[in-house]
């Protein structure tokens, strides 16, 4: 079944020049396609909506600060099982636990600055795509 998912390349990925490498890995995997891509600086309101479920947790404020520290790449990936697949390609949040060959395993340095966000379910993908790409049908 063809799916769509939101992927964010976080400020550390942009700062380190990893956009092409990460986008290439997504495109090469299982014939997935990038159907929208924007470089943007996220405002506090958008981030609050996106990460609202984490408000009050110890990592929330540092995460909000980090995500506003520079531009991000927001993109839409489409393909068979792309939601599960991009998360697997990204690897676990902790780069030490991430296997070589995964994005975080190959390029990750610390848990908080972990290069990439990918929707974790069809429901999350739908909500996140509406937030980041409201004009998408």
From Swiss-Prot:
- Catalytic reactions on record: a 2'-deoxyribonucleoside 5'-diphosphate + ATP = a 2'-deoxyribonucleoside 5'-triphosphate + ADP; a ribonucleoside 5'-diphosphate + ATP = a ribonucleoside 5'-triphosphate + ADP
Keyword Glycoprotein among record annotations: no
Q: Does the keyword Chloroplast apply?
A: no
Q: Which cofactor does it need?
A: Mg(2+)
Q: Which domain of life is it from?
A: Bacteria
Quote the catalytic residue positions.
Answer: 117
The record's principal subcellular location, in a coarse class, is cytoplasm
Could you tell me the EC number(s) of this protein?
A: 2.7.4.6
Q: Which GO terms describe its biological process?
A: CTP biosynthetic process; GTP biosynthetic process; UTP biosynthetic process
Kindly list the positions annotated as binding ATP: 10, 59, 87, 93, 104, 114
Family matches, as Gene3D superfamilies? Nucleoside diphosphate kinase-like domain (3.30.70.141)
Paired cysteines (S-S): none
Pfam families listed in its UniProt record: NDK (PF00334)
Q: Name one GO cellular component term.
A: cytoplasm
Q: Which leading EC class covers this enzyme?
A: transferase
Cross-referenced PROSITE patterns: NDPK, NDPK_LIKE
The subunit field of the Swiss-Prot or TrEMBL record says: Homotetramer.
Q: HAMAP family annotated for this entry?
A: NDP_kinase
For this chain, the family text in UniProt reads: Belongs to the NDK family.
The protein's name? Nucleoside diphosphate kinase
Please give the organism: Streptomyces griseus subsp. griseus (strain JCM 4626 / CBS 651.72 / NBRC 13350 / KCC S-0626 / ISP 5235)
């Amino acid at each position: 079944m063809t799916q769509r998912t939101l992927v964010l390349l976080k400020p550390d990925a942009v700062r380190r020049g990893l956009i092409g490498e990460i986008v290439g890995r997504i495109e090469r995997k299982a014939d997935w396609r990038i159907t929208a891509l924007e470089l943007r600086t996220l405002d506090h309101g958008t981030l609050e909506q996106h990460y609202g479920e984490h408000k009050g947790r110890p990592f929330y404020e540092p995460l909000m600060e980090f995500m506003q520290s520079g531009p991000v790449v927001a993109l839409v990936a489409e393909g068979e099982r792309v939601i599960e697949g991009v998360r697997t390609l990204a690897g676990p949040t902790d780069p030490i636990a991430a296997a070589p060959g995964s994005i975080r395993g190959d390029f990750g340095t610390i848990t908080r600055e972990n290069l990439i966000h990918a929707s974790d379910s069809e429901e999350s993908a739908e909500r996140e795509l509406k937030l980041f790409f409201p004009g998408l049908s």
